């Protein structure tokens, strides 16, 4: 892992804590890794992957991060928090199903002034198609920029949902 670019975002390492009550109830030792103490939003293990993904994006010049998830996605909220901490602009394209009012992660995204867009679908394929559409529109702007018809202001990183870690980036290198 030392060979990969990383920007420390989390307070690490987080403790492992014995859960006394459930250990007693189950008559066995039960422990929990306290990744709620990473120091970013409500925490979670996703901050660890974002340290690498966003470091790579910053190295490549990305200024905007797209990602997706459910209406209350921890991945999306933590991506927004980490991106904001690094001076990047997060854009979340979320499923409209579920809690979409300002509760939980939606409230945190609102407080961070995050650009949140809802799609009325249960299908990630539909959301990825929308991300692809936006990406192709962006690629059209890249072509126009290369032809001297348009000067882009941002590089964009598209970060797919959840813990899968799938990633693709559009890098622009213009003279």
Which functions belong to the PLM regions below?
Residues 1-175:
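PLP-dependent amino-acid enzyme catalytic core
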